[in-house]
Amino acid sequence: MKNILDYTLEELTLWMKENNESSFRAKQIMSWIYKDVRNFSDMRNMPKSLIAKLEENFEIALPEIEEIYKSELDGTEKFLFKFSDGNLIESVLMRYKHGNSICISTQVGCRMGCKFCASTIDGRIRNLTTGEILAQILVVQNHIGERISNVVLMGSGEPLDNYENVMKFLDIVSAEYGLNIGQRHITLSTCGIVPKIYELADKELSITLAISLHAFSDEKRKEIMPIANKYSIDEILNACKYFVNKTKRRITFEYSLVKDVNDSKEDARALGKLLKGMLCHVNLIPVNEIKERTFKRSSKETIQDFANILSNLGIEVTVRREMGSDINAACGQLRRSYIKTQETRGE
C-alpha cells in the first residue's frame, strides 16, 4: 500500500484521472491531510466510492513517537521516531519568540563519515521517503498543537544524498496545498556534494543553503570529513558562488570548533581570507562531544576569539546558541543510545 504523503498534488491529480475520478478531488484530499485528518473516512466531502478506492490503495503512514526528551531550560524537545520497519530517527523542536523551528532527518544513519557526527557511525541504513520526511513535521505539530514555522534539514543523514525525495519534500512543504512553510524559512545543510549543489541552484529556490565546511584547507578537512577526498574546497566554493548567483541567497558556512584541531587564530584568519568577498555568513558551532570520538570542544574564550577575528576581517559571524543543553545529545546519539539500551534489555 502506498503512503499518500509521498504524493505531490500533481501526482495525486494524475492518479485521480487514471482512476476515473474528478481532478479537483486531489486538492480536497490534500487539504484534509494537511489539516491533520488521518482517516480517509473522515474526509466529509468525499463520495463513499472514492473513499473506498483511497482505502484500498493508500495509507496515511506516520511514525510512532518512541521517546520525547524535554529541556527544563528552554522547552527544546527531542523526538525519537520509530517507523513501521523498526528503524529509528530523530527530530528536534526548538521554541523561539518568532515561532517554532524543527530540525529533521532525511536518512536513517548516514554514509558521509564525518568524524564529529554520531549519526554516521553505523553508516547509512536507508533513505527516508518524502512522506517520512514530511511526517516528522506533521507528528510534532499534532503533538504540540502549534504550527511549525521554520524547518532545518540538519538531522541524521545527508539531504543531497537523498536528492529526489528531499526535492519533492521541499515542493510539498512550501506549497499552499501542503504545509505552506515559506522557502525562506527552510534551511538545507550539506557536507558538500558538489554536483547536487549545482542542480539545487538551478531550481532557483529561496531556501538557505548551509555548507558544513569545518576547515579552511583540503588537508585539514580530509582529517575530519571523508567527502573532502572527493570534492575540494575550491570546487565547493565555486558551486556556492553559482548558487548565490542563481538564487541571490546568502550562503551559510557551518564551522564546528574542535579543540586543537581547527580552532586556532591562524585557522580563523585563513578562513576569513578564504571567504572574503562572498555573500556568506559563518555559523560557529561548539562541537558536540560524543564518546565514540576523541574530539573536545573549544573553550568559550577560544570560540569568541575566533569569532572576533572573522568579524574584524569583514565576515558576518554568529556563534550557535545552544538549545536544550540539559538534554544535550549530538545528532544521532539519541537513536544510538536507545538502540543500545534495548539490546541490553534483550528487547
UniProtKB/Swiss-Prot annotation:
Organism this protein belongs to: Clostridium botulinum (strain Eklund 17B / Type B)
Key words of the record: 4Fe-4S, Cytoplasm, Disulfide bond, Iron, Iron-sulfur, Metal-binding, Methyltransferase, rRNA processing, S-adenosyl-L-methionine, Transferase, tRNA processing
Function per UniProt: Specifically methylates position 2 of adenine 2503 in 23S rRNA and position 2 of adenine 37 in tRNAs.
Name recorded for this polypeptide: Probable dual-specificity RNA methyltransferase RlmN
Disulfide bonds: C103-C331
UniProt xrefs under NCBIfam families: rRNA_mod_RlmN (TIGR00048)
Cofactor (UniProt): [4Fe-4S] cluster
Binding of [4Fe-4S] cluster, residues: C110, C114, C117
Species lineage: Bacteria, Bacillati, Bacillota, Clostridia, Eubacteriales
Domain of life: Bacteria
Gene Ontology cellular component terms for the protein in this record: cytoplasm
E.C. number(s) listed in UniProt: 2.1.1.192
Active site: E90 (proton acceptor), C331 (s-methylcysteine intermediate)
One GO process term, biological-process aspect: tRNA methylation
